Structures are given as structure tokens and as C-alpha cells.
Amino acid sequence: MSKSESLYAQAKQLIPGGVNSPVRAFTGVGGVPLFIERADGAYLFDVDGKAYIDYVGSWGPMVLGHNHPAIRQAVIEAVERGLSFGAPTEMEVKMAELVTNLVPTMDMVRMVNSGTEATMSAIRLARGFTGRDKIIKFEGCYHGHADCLLVKAGSGALTLGQPNSPGVPADFAKHTLTCTYNDLASVREAFEQYPRDIACIIVEPVAGNMNCVPPLPEFLPGLRALCDKFGALLIIDEVMTGFRVALAGAQDYYNVIPDLTCLGKIIGGGMPVGAFGGRRDVMDALAPTGPVYQAGTLSGNPIAMAAGFACLTEVAQVGIHETLTELTNLLADGLLDAAKAENIPLVVNHVGGMFGLFFTDAPTVTCYQDVMNCDVERFKRFFHLMLEEGVYLAPSAFEAGFMSVAHSKEDIQKTVDAARRCFAKL
């Protein structure tokens, strides 16, 4: 029995499912999850001593690679001054200034502790600001585990939402309308049915929780236009895409202006941080200046702020995103060539430092239904074959992959060579 197997057996007796976040349990691919001892650069090292080229990157934050020296040093120095004060610090101000400078649509920003907190708070703020209750989300998009967001689509885009997790009252979910990603007609129909009831649209500008599905050219501008027409706010969830697709996020890459933006992952440099911000008049409705309540004991804590400030300072350096895109393109092209050589039907979606692999005969993958039509069983086999080769992909056919600037061209070539051998076995 490997040490990972032993630890997993022990963990299942102490932690529900043996993990503290479900996807880590390898439920989507089968088998025993890796228990990690350390990480450095583009590599993970498990408790059994095996190294892996890592394309999960802690689910997105590690855009600079693991254990980056500038972030590590910033955390060490912050720890020496104290872990948490429950009072304002200078670093919170510096961090807010940096974020609002990097993301011009954010006039003001409020720090929280996770992406879920960011989206939950932004939706509450949108409801409070507009005086409306209903929200629109999209099938296949994930915005954290707040009750109003754990909703699946019904028989049509306008079906009142039903919860897809026990413990979420139907009365909560009924205010969530689920539309089809990349389908403006479904959104337009929702607004026409509830013209004065919808507070906001919340959307992933690149859907990264049904693998990686970029928006069609007309989709995000169309959402902006519909929000303007019907008096709703547009919330862009950049928890995954922020500072990764482009320095100012996917909103800059796709040239769309949101009312509110949610951030996470990279903003913490590996520490638990989230943030939301946007128009000054909307943010002024937030307590203590306004009536919409939001709070957090550890929000803006000095360790997380130090890590995030160091990370964003590095990410803002000239050339980072060009390198990230070049490496991702190199990987995508190499995987497509390797799959073609072995007659394996494969679509690779990618933008900036995000990518997704789809085993499908379809020419494109642009929505949730396209994703669901892909060959999940083939992905499972591919995942485990790649794991044996020392390449760690996301352990789910419905999660995006992430590149870092710590990955070398040699790492990419090793990955492509491994994939070619694995494709030959499929």
C-alpha cells in the first residue's frame, strides 16, 4: 500500500470523503487521490516521493508557479509581525490600490476570504442596490457554494430554479434563473418574462467549471446590453480568469465593462483570499457606508494581503501574460498534433493561461450540452495514464487546466511526449 493510499484510508475515517473539497477525492476519475508533500515551480511531489508536472496549480492561483520566492518572503516577513489583528492595516490599503489600478472597472474593492464569499456578497449587494430578488446564472457555470447558486436548469431556461444539493430550500432557489451559456436568446427571454425582477446576471467570462469554454464574440457584449436595457447589474466572476487571461482579466481581453467584478485565486498568491468591487455608487451601498451588510473576521488579514500584494506585483511585470499565452498555445498545439497522430478525436479550448481537453468528434465545444456529450470514460483513462507518466491534470473532465510561467518549454515537450504515448493506449 502506498503512503497516499494509507493516508486516504485514514482520512476517510476523519473527514467526509477523506477530503476538504469534493473534487480532490478523484470521484470524477476513480482511484486514490495523491497526497502532496511539497511543490516547487511547475512540479508537485507526493508523499511517496514521485514528481509530477502540475497543470492544476492549486486550481488556478499558482500562475507564477509553486513556492515563488517573492511570495514566500513576503509571507515570512508578514508572519513575523503577527498573524491577524482584526483592525485595518496599511497593507490592506496598498492591496486595494494595486487591485483597482490593475482592474480599471473597479472603483472600489472589498476583501473577503474566498471566491464563494466574493460572489455571495456581490449578489447580495446587487439585490440591495436594485431592490430586486431574481438573478440569472448559466448552466455549467460555478460561482461557489452559496445556496442561491447551487441551482440546476429545469426543463427550460425560464424554469424556476430547483436546488441541486440537499439542504438548499426551494424557496431560496426559486429566485435563480438558469440560462444557457453562449445563448443570448435564453437570456433575452428571461428578461422579457421578468423585466422588473432581475437584479443581476452573474457569469464566468470564460466558463472554467465545465472544463474551459470561452465566450462567443457576441455573448458578453450582449449580456451588457441586456443589463443596460432592463436595469440589472452585470457581475463578472473573474475568480478563475482574473490576472490569468489578461492582466486586467477576461473583461479586458473581451472588452466588456461589468458593474461588479469578483476575484479570487491569483489575488491571494496561494493564500485564501477573495474580493469584489466595481462602480463606486454600487459599492457605496455596502456597510458601513450603506445598508447592505457584509463582514468577515479574517477579511483583509495581513498574511493574505502580503502574499497577494507580492503575487500581483510580480504578475504585473511586462511579458508575463505573453509568456503564459505562448506556453499554453504550445501545449494545446502539441496535444492536438499528438492526438491526431493516434486518430484520437480531441478539441482543445484555451485562452491566456487556461485550457481544456475534450474527447469529442464535434468540431467545437461552446456550451454545457457540448461538454456533456464528450467522452468522459476516455478522459478518465487518459487522466490515469498521464498520472503514471508523471503529469498531473485536473481529476475531472469538467475542470479547466492551468499553465504557469514556471513551466518550461521542456516541461511542455515532456507533457506532449507523454500524451502521445497515452493516446496510443486509448
From Swiss-Prot:
Record HAMAP family: HemL_aminotrans_3 (MF_00375)
Gene Ontology terms, MF aspect: glutamate-1-semialdehyde 2,1-aminomutase activity; pyridoxal phosphate binding; transaminase activity
Claim: Lipid metabolism is one of the keywords in the record: no
Keyword set includes Cytoplasm: yes
Necessary cofactors: pyridoxal 5'-phosphate
Family assignment from sequence similarity: Belongs to the class-III pyridoxal-phosphate-dependent aminotransferase family. HemL subfamily.
InterPro entries: 4pyrrol_synth_GluAld_NH2Trfase, Aminotrans_3, Aminotrans_3_PPA_site, PyrdxlP-dep_Trfase, PyrdxlP-dep_Trfase_major, PyrdxlP-dep_Trfase_small
GO cellular component, one term: cytoplasm
Entry's localization field: Cytoplasm
Organism superkingdom: Bacteria
Keywords, comma-separated and alphabetical: Cytoplasm, Isomerase, Porphyrin biosynthesis, Pyridoxal phosphate
EC number: 5.4.3.8
Listed NCBIfam families: hemL (TIGR00713), PRK00062.1 (NF000818)
Chain's gene name: hemL
Catalytic activity: (S)-4-amino-5-oxopentanoate = 5-aminolevulinate
Modified residues (N6-(pyridoxal phosphate)lysine): 265
PANTHER family: GLUTAMATE-1-SEMIALDEHYDE 2,1-AMINOMUTASE, GLUTAMATE-1-SEMIALDEHYDE 2,1-AMINOMUTASE 1, CHLOROPLASTIC-RELATED
A GO BP entry: protoporphyrinogen IX biosynthetic process
Assembly and interaction partners: Homodimer.
Annotated metabolic or biological route of this protein: Porphyrin-containing compound metabolism; protoporphyrin-IX biosynthesis; 5-aminolevulinate from L-glutamyl-tRNA(Glu): step 2/2
Taxonomic lineage of the native organism: Bacteria, Pseudomonadati, Pseudomonadota, Gammaproteobacteria, Enterobacterales
Principal location listed in the UniProt entry: cytoplasm
Pfam families (UniProt xref): Aminotran_3 (PF00202)
Protein name (Swiss-Prot/TrEMBL): Glutamate-1-semialdehyde 2,1-aminomutase
